[in-house]
Regions:
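Predominantly extracellular beta-rich ligand-binding scaffolds that present long acidic/polar faces
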Residues: 77-93, 100, 465-601
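Boundary at the C-terminal end of the N-terminal hydrophobic targeting segment
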Residues: 21-23
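Extracellular polysaccharide-degrading/modifying enzymes targeting complex plant/algal/animal polysaccharides
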Residues: 25-291, 296, 303, 577-584, ...
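Right-handed parallel beta-helix
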Residues: 270-281, 293-306, 316-330, 339-358, ...
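C-terminal beta-sandwich/jelly-roll accessory domains of carbohydrate-active enzymes
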Residues: 603-657
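Bacterial N-terminal signal peptides
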Residues: 8-17
């Protein structure tokens, strides 16, 4: 039996070696190529093929291990429709040759021959999908009413209509889309059926959230909204793209719209590698990956995408590494629970989901990275400027590690830099060594316009079995770390500085099936409030059970002038809500928690972090001591993705009782 296995393995190795030995490269150049060349000629970079159309018609003849190489500096218009798989050790490779910029696969069409319709609106024939409009390289929002902010509605009927008592029929909005902020974290796009009086009736479509009375809406995708430069509307019946230019000449601008839904469409094909390419202007997704195994996207740039840059469904062993993803209207990378064993590493993802109403409906949108597969690694990514969550992940044994996330919850809120909301009861999730800064929040279109709900790390309803360690969170509008109806959470060695509240544990049970906060362990963290309006910690419950939340001890707390409001609690006793405020000393005496925790001074403090992959050395102008009483005289050295709080020696006194 063992001899037979060895022979089979040897035979497989020989076959794979032979496949690789006979693998060939096919060359493409949009500037020098000719599609009339033979396949033998196309193996020579001096006689390349020209177009993506030629690639798609020839694809069935490509063999495992073959390479498709595009000339650097060239632009290829259209899309790639994959119709062949590679092999486990011999993937089909898409790459580049020559010198210069990355070759670009471009899904845009240029609009020309503009005709004045009236009132500053011009039209151009548009035979394409027209999901996006790009003006001089900048994505434009659909025309909308009002031009900014939200109108509000007083009532609704199910998920079918809203009524705004101030809206009248001076302008009839009987077509287009109504964009409704149904909750703080949901912006839905619904097709309008009719407008009568103050009532707009719409199709629910695939949206399931019901509107909240008093929240906001606006109208878009209707020609009557066009009154600001760059606003647009596509009349798909008459194939007409209408754009408001005002008194400007449209011929002085480069105007593009999406000509393809997907730039790379992979459905049930495996073992493909895309390396060193640029993908621009997909109407929907630059990469649409369905039931396909071992797809690798490496060192690529993905720009100006109509929904997500990369969306994958039931596609295990997906790798996205060393890529730059910029200006995606709905999401950066989106992977469902079938995308197990994924690796998302060392990518830069920026400007995601920043135009309200231009992303997709429902949850899991306006996010940089969304992942629900088991054994996923999300590591060393840089996320900058995202409409909602920086990273939303779940899945058994999945990890978010050493990511740098800054400026999030810019379009929606009640979200976080790193968010886990796990109704699937997965276990062994880890949040390690991340740096999360600038949780902004956006409460426009809600009843709470003075409250910004942006958390640094947010562990939401029914989540369990999470380790949160060695993270740095600062400058978040609401909470640094928030635990909401979750259990079995370990919070160790984190530095939480200058957030609205540094540690928040909230149990409310608005949803009857939510977990109770139990068996949590909070130790060796630094919770540093910088202003009088901030708290170091806040605990709340709909019962009288804060003592059952878990073990909280050996932490470092700091608040200005040892404020009485440094720590707050809220619980229900004998049917009445009891709100309390504490100094650390009083909190210890009343809660039985934080027995070995200490207070830090707030004056003459130095906070530094290192959000890079290299060791960082910081020169010190005076002598400092860290919270563990280690002294630093001339410099402090920080490892990658670490931070430190230093206290000038003259002010350091650690109070533990």
């Amino acid at each position: 039996m063992k001899k037979g296995v060895k022979c089979n393995l040897l035979l497989i190795a020989i076959i794979l070696f032979c496949n690789q030995a006979y693998a060939v490269s096919y060359y493409f150049s949009s500037t020098l190529g000719n599609d009339d060349y033979t396949s033998l000629q196309a193996r020579n970079p001096a006689t390349p093929w020209k177009s993506l159309e030629k690639l798609n018609t020839f694809f069935r003849n490509i063999n495992t291990g073959d390479s498709i190489l595009f000339k650097r500096g060239d632009v290829f218009y259209g899309s790639i429709n994959v119709t062949k798989s590679g092999a486990v050790f011999a993937p089909i490779h898409f790459g580049a040759y020559g010198t210069g910029k990355k070759p670009e696969i471009n899904g845009l069409a240029t609009l020309k021959k503009w005709k004045l319709v009236g009132n500053g609106i011009y039209e151009s024939n548009c035979e394409t999908t027209g999901n996006t409009l790009i003006l001089n390289g900048v994505q434009q929002a659909l025309g909308r009413y009002p031009n900014k902010g939200y109108l509000s509605f007083e009532s609704h009927s199910g998920n079918n209509s809203i009524t705004d008592n101030q809206l009248n029929e001076a302008i009839n909005w009987g077509s287009g889309e109504v964009v409704i902020k149904k909750t703080r974290w949901i912006i839905d796009r619904n097709s309008i059926v009719s407008h009568k009086g103050g009532t707009i009736t719409y199709r629910a479509g695939n949206t399931t959230y019901v509107p909240t009375n008093g929240y906001g809406y606006f109208i878009q995708n209707n020609v009557k909204t066009l009154d600001q430069f760059g606003e647009w509307y596509l009349d798909s019946v008459h194939h007409s793209m209408m754009v408001y230019f005002g008194n400007k000449n449209p011929n002085n601008f480069v105007v593009n719209t999406s000509a393809v839904n997907y730039i790379v469409d992979v459905r049930r094909y495996n073992y493909l590698t895309f390396d060193g390419l640029t993908f621009t202007g997909a109407g929907n997704n630059a990469f649409n990956i369905v039931q396909s195994k071992k797809i690798s996207i490496i060192n690529c740039s993905i720009n100006l995408t109509g929904t997500e840059a990369i969306i994958a469904s039931y596609s295990p062993f997906l790798t996205v590494k060393d890529c730059i993803i910029d200006h995606s209207l709905s999401g950066g990378i989106n992977m469902d629970a079938g995308c197990v064993n994924a690796t998302i590493a060392n990518n830069t993802i920026k400007n995601t989901g920043l135009l309200p109403g231009m992303g997709k409906s429902n949850s899991g949108t306006y996010e940089a990275i969304t992942s629900f597969g088991d054994n996923t690694k999300i590591e060393k990514n840089r996320i900058d400027s995202v409409g909602y969550n920086g990273i939303y992940f779940g899945g058994n044994t999945s990890t978010a590690k050493n990511n740098f996330i800054t400026y999030f919850c810019l379009t929606k809120d009640d979200g976080a830099g790193i968010y886990i909301g796990d109704w699937s009861k997965t276990v062994n999730k880890k949040v390690i060594g991340n740096i999360v800064l600038h949780g902004v929040g956006n409460s426009e279109g809600t009843l709470h316009t003075n409250s910004m709900q942006a958390e640094g790390i947010y562990i939401d309803d029914n989540t369990e079995s999470v380790i949160i360690t060695n993270n740095t969170v600062s400058l978040c509008a609401n909470n640094g770390i928030k635990i909401h109806n979750a259990k079995d959470i370990d919070i160790f060695n984190n530095t939480i500085v200058d957030n609205g509240v540094q540690l928040r544990m909230e149990q409310d049970h608005y949803i009857a099936t939510s977990s109770y906060i139990r068996n949590n362990n909070v130790r060796n963290n630094t919770f540093f409030a910088k202003t009088d309006t901030q708290q170091t910690a806040k605990f709340s419950t709909h019962q009288d059970d804060i003592k059952a939340f878990g073990q909280i001890d050996s932490n470092f707390y700091s608040s200005p002038k040892n404020l009485v409001t440094a720590i707050k609690s809220s619980s229900v006793k004998n049917g009445k809500t009891v709100n309390s405020s504490y100094t650390l000393v009083n909190w210890k005496a009343n809660s039985g928690k934080d027995r070995f925790s200490s207070e830090l001074p707030t004056e003459d403090i130095l906070f530094e972090y290192n959000a890079s992959n290299e060791v960082k050395t910081i020169t010190l102008k005076k002598k400092y001591t860290d919270v563990y009483k280690k002294s630093y005289n001339n410099k402090v050295t920080l490892d990658p993705y670490c931070s430190i709080i230093l206290v000038a020696n003259k002010t350091l006194t650690l109070a533990s009782n």
